[in-house]
């Protein structure tokens, strides 16, 4: 199956299925000499793992990572880094009723028509379970970006269903299971999810991600633009149906006199472009928003067809996230970090010695 690798110089190839013995990834292109332990990776995996609150899937996976290669005496060697996460709480019997039937909104039908075979247990390869290795690889990327350039990649939930979550402070994000930057909204989010679970339904979410400290110059026009690669990576996350960079779709209603970010000796006056111009980073914060659709696995009976093309009714059982967006923040952060480290290495390879006489201005004039 092709399409399992992300990146050009810093590559990540994932493997495994939701109910297989293990999942994992192979990272190639990581620079040598960086300190790296399983604890460095585990801290990020623990932010994404299931079973952490009543609002997410109750599948109990420890998601304990094993570093199989690429690290010697706690230091990266420059050779491929293999990460392994063993599946320990599969419950395949929950999927016995969909062996011959396609679940609406899932990849069951498309995988079957493309490959002529599918692993029906938890969605197999198409499961969001496969985002765990992405978060593991993202931990490596985050560490290198932070230590080498001071880049910080952080995210938060900015909307759940009809509820907007206004940003208050980053310190709130780690204090609740929603990654909400506004502690005052958390009780409303909890009540909303409790009612949704009783209804046997699901809902979508919006996640915002910000990368600060990114230098000017990263990105490869025309077809490997930084924002294009970010959009591709974000759309590779399960259930993501929309991506915005900067002002995004709000740009439609903005006039050029408003949208164009003016430059002054003191810095940029605005950041409607989201930190990217011409596919190249400006030195400002890179701002990304993603829209995540409602979970397709719900208890409400829905119409579908069987492999024979006959009408069928599907009721989904098993342990599922009523809103996959609740655990998506560390995944989106990881995807952004993976794109950034790849472009950092590509920039260093081609333009690392380039210097200009023009001062690098601040990301914000204020």
From Swiss-Prot:
Looking up InterPro entries in the UniProt record yields: Chorismate_synth, Chorismate_synth_AroC_sf, Chorismate_synthase_CS
Q: Which reaction does it catalyse?
A: 5-O-(1-carboxyvinyl)-3-phosphoshikimate = chorismate + phosphate
Q: What is the uppermost EC class here?
A: lyase
Q: Signal peptide: which range, if any?
A: none
* Binding, FMN: 125-127, 238-239, 278, 293-297, 319
Q: Name the cofactor(s) required for activity, per the record.
A: FMNH2
Q: GO molecular function of the protein, one example?
A: FMN binding
Q: Where are the transmembrane segments?
A: none
Gene Ontology cellular component annotations, sorted alphabetically: cytosol
* EC number per UniProt: 4.2.3.5
Q: Which UniProt keywords apply?
A: Amino-acid biosynthesis, Aromatic amino acid biosynthesis, FAD, Flavoprotein, FMN, Lyase, NADP
Biological process GO terms, please? amino acid biosynthetic process; aromatic amino acid family biosynthetic process; chorismate biosynthetic process
Q: Which Pfam families match?
A: Chorismate_synt
Q: Answer yes or no on keyword Repeat.
A: no
Cofactor binding comment, as recorded: Reduced FMN (FMNH(2)).
* Positions bound to NADP(+): 48, 54
The protein's annotated pathway: Metabolic intermediate biosynthesis; chorismate biosynthesis; chorismate from D-erythrose 4-phosphate and phosphoenolpyruvate: step 7/7
Entry-linked HAMAP family: Chorismate_synth
Relate the assembly described in the record. Answer: Homotetramer.
The record describes the protein's role as: This reaction introduces a second double bond into the aromatic ring system.
Q: Which family does it belong to?
A: Belongs to the chorismate synthase family.
Protein's recorded name: Chorismate synthase
Organism the protein comes from? Burkholderia cenocepacia (strain HI2424)
């Amino acid at each position: 199956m092709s399409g399992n690798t992300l990146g050009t110089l810093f590559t990540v190839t994932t493997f495994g299925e939701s109910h297989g013995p293990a999942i994992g990834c192979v990272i190639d292109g990581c620079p040598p000499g960086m300190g790296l332990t399983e604890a460095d990776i585990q801290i990020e995996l623990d932010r994404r793992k299931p079973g952490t609150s009543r609002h997410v899937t109750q599948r109990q996976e420890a998601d304990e990572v094993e570093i199989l290669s690429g690290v010697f005496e706690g230091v990266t060697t420059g050779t491929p880094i293999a990460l392994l996460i063993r599946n320990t709480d599969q419950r395949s019997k929950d999927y016995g009723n969909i062996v011959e039937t396609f679940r609406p909104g899932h990849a069951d039908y498309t995988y079957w028509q493309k490959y002529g075979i599918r692993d029906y247990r938890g969605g197999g390869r198409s499961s969001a379970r496969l985002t765990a290795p992405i978060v593991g690889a993202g931990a490596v990327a985050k560490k290198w970006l932070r230590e080498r350039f001071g880049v910080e990649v952080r995210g938060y939930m900015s909307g759940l269903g009809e509820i907007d979550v206004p940003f208050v402070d980053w310190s709130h994000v780690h204090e609740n299971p929603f990654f909400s930057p506004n502690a005052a909204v958390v009780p409303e989010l909890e009540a909303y999810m409790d009612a949704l679970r009783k209804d046997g339904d699901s809902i979508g979410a919006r996640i915002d991600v910000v990368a600060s400290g990114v230098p000017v110059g990263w990105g490869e026009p025309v077809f490997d633009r930084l924002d294009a690669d970010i959009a591709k990576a974000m759309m590779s996350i399960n259930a993501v149906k929309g991506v915005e960079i900067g002002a995004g779709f709000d740009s439609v209603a903005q006039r050029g006199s408003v949208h164009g970010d003016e430059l002054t000796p003191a810095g940029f006056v605005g950041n409607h472009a989201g930190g990217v111009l011409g596919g190249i980073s400006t030195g400002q914060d890179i701002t990304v928003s993603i829209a995540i659709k409602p979970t397709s696995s719900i208890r409400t009976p829905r119409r579908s067809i069987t492999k024979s093309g006959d009408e069928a009714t599907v009721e989904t059982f098993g342990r599922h996230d009523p809103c996959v967006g609740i655990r998506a923040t560390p995944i989106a952060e990881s995807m952004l970090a993976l794109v950034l480290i790849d472009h950092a290495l590509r920039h260093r390879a081609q333009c690392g010695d380039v210097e200009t006489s023009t001062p690098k201005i601040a990301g914000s004039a204020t």
